[in-house]
Amino acid sequence: MVTMRDLLECGVHFGHQTRRWNPKMKKFIFGERKGIYIIDLQKTIRYFRYTYNIVRDAAAEGKTVLFVGTKKQAGVAIKEYAEKCGMPYVNHRWLGGMMTNFGTIKQSIRKLEVIEAMEEDGSINLLTKKEALMLRRKKEKLLATLGGIRNMKSLPDMVFVIDTVKEKIAVAEANKLRMPVVAPIDTNCDPDIVDFPIPGNDDAIRSVQLFCQEMAEAINEGKALRDQDEAEQVEPVSQEEKDEVVAEAMSEADFEEQ
């Protein structure tokens, strides 16, 4: 689990310039230095550890966490750590209605599967060069926007977001669907729209990587607990099974006595 040293080394305490802030973040600010707000890391570590446990427990219950972060500093880490914990992700562009109009999104994912099937069975080669080119372009476009959620068969149970200001549409959709939002909140963010906030820098690459890494670790820890629980569970014995085993034993005994 994250330590104070981790937070300091990754620059989690550096907020935005003092002229770019949300007054609702006042309670998370330690002070100001050279025109930059400094985030109170004592609060950060407390919120971080609490949220880690929330995410771990959600994963232990088999819940799905959607990773969202489309800006340059976040895209690579979002994909890397979502894949490490087997969760869906959006790291290219958030399409409006990705959750509130999920049925349409699933239709687009199906189109991607159709194009891939045409490539696999060779039927794409029966088209004109222009048709094949247009299909392949469409495939690349669909992969970029939907590749990270192509295996997401239903809406996620929770959303982990990097930069709630940039990803305001994703957060608004999650809020509308009453889907819990987990997110680092920088000094320019609105903490009221996040269910499980972690005060911290959401711009620096190392800080973003730390948040993604910790969420992935929490999920993998939760999955391990779930696997352990399932392994320990013994299937309950029905009366019918008891009667069947008794009858079988009696039948074997009768056979041996003959």
UniProtKB/Swiss-Prot annotation:
UniProt xrefs under InterPro entries: Ribosomal_uS2, Ribosomal_uS2_bac/mit/plastid, Ribosomal_uS2_CS, Ribosomal_uS2_flav_dom_sf
Cystine pairs: none
Domain of life, source organism: Bacteria
Any one GO molecular-function label of the UniProt entry: structural constituent of ribosome
Sequence intervals crossing the membrane: none
GO terms of biological process kind: translation
Keyword Ribosomal protein annotated: yes
Keyword Ribosomal protein on entry: yes
Keywords: Ribonucleoprotein, Ribosomal protein
Region listing for Disordered, in residue ranges: 222-258
Annotated SUPFAM superfamilies: Ribosomal protein S2 (SSF52313)
GO cellular component, as recorded: cytosolic small ribosomal subunit
HAMAP family linked: Ribosomal_uS2_B
NCBIfam families: rpsB_bact
Family: Belongs to the universal ribosomal protein uS2 family.
Name of the protein in its database record: Small ribosomal subunit protein uS2
Species this protein is from: Campylobacter fetus subsp. fetus (strain 82-40)
Taxon lineage: Bacteria, Pseudomonadati, Campylobacterota, Epsilonproteobacteria, Campylobacterales
